[in-house]
């Protein structure tokens, strides 16, 4: 894997978190997505909380966000986040932020 000049930490989700996510993925027939993983390590994404409805979504930008979060499970230093369509693994350092 080339570094490409990125200073992004080369941290991977723990084995325990991956096993937990795989079990849920098999049970609920949902894909596991890691496209928010690196961004969650560098605070480049957040858990957006809509002020009007208290609905939660993962947000990278105004154009990049997930479907509604149905459940957030803590697994060690990570969260396994279930949405309507997918399972995301993010760092537990991810911050909630109010969105409109």
Predicted feature residues:
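N-terminal non-globular leader segments, chiefly Sec-dependent signal peptides
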Residues: 1-78, 84-86, 93-100
């Amino acid at each position: 894997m080339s570094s490409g000049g990125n200073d992004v930490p080369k941290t991977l989700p723990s084995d325990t978190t991956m096993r937990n996510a795989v079990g849920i993925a098999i049970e609920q027939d949902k894909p596991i997505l890691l496209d928010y993983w690196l961004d969650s390590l560098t605070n480049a994404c957040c858990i957006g909380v809509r002020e009007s409805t208290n609905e939660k979504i993962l947000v990278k930008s105004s154009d990049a966000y997930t479907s509604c979060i149905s459940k957030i499970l803590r697994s060690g230093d990570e969260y396994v986040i279930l949405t309507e369509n997918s399972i995301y693994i993010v760092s537990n350092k991810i911050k909630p932020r109010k969105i409109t």
